[in-house]
Amino acid sequence: MFSVRYKAIALSALLLLFGCLCGCEKGSGAYIFKAAIVGNPKTLDPQTALADSSANIIYNTFRGLFGYDTEGNIVPDMAESYSVSGDGLEWTFTLRGGVYWYADDFSAKCTADDFVFAFRRLINPAVKSAGAADFFVLKNAEKINKGTMTDLSLLGVEAVNETTLKITLEYPDSDLPVLLASSAAMPCNEEFFETTEGRYGLSADCVASNGAFYVHTWSYDEWSEDSNYFILRRNTLNVPPDDESIPVGMNFFIDAKEACSDFCDGTFGAYITDSAEEISELSGKYTYNTYETAVWGLVFNPKRFSDAQLRLKFAEKCTFSDSDCYRSAWRITPPFNYGEKNSASLSADDIEMPASVNVVMPQNMELREQMNAVAQEWRTSFGISCSVFEPETQTYEQRLQSGDYDIALVRISGTNSSKYAYLSAFLSNSPRNFTGQNSKKFDHILDSAKKEQNEAIRESYYSEAESFLLESGLFAPVCSQTDYVFFGKKSQGMCYNPYLGAYIAIK
């Protein structure tokens, strides 16, 4: 999932990664970029969107204060320039002129008021944005979001004039630009928002764009396999028709069944896979990059596995073997297999075992084989019945959200390479926290890390937080995942961001 936390990024690590991630060849933009995406987004409202698939649309149709350049550096975008006060609490932004909103029958200049309205929506408890807590660094944001303060105008975001925005913080945060490059920090035009009458972000005609493209068509029918797609076309108010640095449009196909063959015949401009068979077939023919940005691990039902020793006992007997796309992992934060493997202290063998265990995992052939081998190990070692289930994607996600599992295999990825980006998945208020347990101790450790200005002390907090999860068996890492991204001829001007899981057109 995406758009949950963007703090405390290690800039040097980001530069090293992005230095080789771009398939950005400049050339004729007189083409339409086409690619497959996984899953239909529930919304394109930047303040509430979570799905990876929405990132492909949002990051090409919206411009925030900060964005990414072709090397992956976080750079000013809508912010033409900015200054920071001596105490680090006030950030003042001068916005670019000549940037416009566009939707059918609507156009308007993008101004500082659009950012104020967006941040107020984000923090407003009535909106119930899962990303609100990430922005508690804004003055009064936490009080407003938790209901102890009700006046939204007291939020530390102010439009000084049409082109000047002032943001006031609760505490200094030198990594604020990383946060402001996130989806949740994208602007929102209040006038257009009101015209959607509660349907903002839910259909193509309920999305206004201040970016290079706008949503022309959003077609989705859950009973159809070939009518599910997005069509983005150039927002000519922001990018001239004769600008050839980026495509003239984009088509994203939702859950395309023949994505690999569509890439091979030149229909798609890029293709992502973790299939060993496809990698072997494509690697000698196309340019590609690899990204190890996700870790898979086990989470346990909090009722059936309330005993930490029981969780650790099962985790101890769970070992995945290495392959091209999956490597054994024992850490939650990257690098996932760095240093010594954690050896948790186990009690005597008198732990009461459940008679049977059901494991839920997403559909994945290679991981299925690994998980079945682990299930057999549990049967042999513990003398229990163990079954592995692979429901459809939507059912799998529903079971995770409702806690309908004994053990679940889940994927954790960060929105950047920082430790916070991964560990924040286990915060009590995180929609990615599938452990079913809310730990005030863990929340306090991460909150301390977030506010700590000393890098060494901050790192010690992160180590403490990760050790807490591992030693209590709340999350048991089993393997990291490497994605292969192949680029075809029709990908000029496009870059791939592995943390956002998105193809982005960058001038």
Language-model segments: which ranges?
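Aromatic- and charge-enriched surface segment that lines or borders ligand/interaction sites
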Residues: 81-134, 306
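Short, well-ordered beta-strand elements
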Residues: 30-39, 90-93, 115-118, 165-166, ...
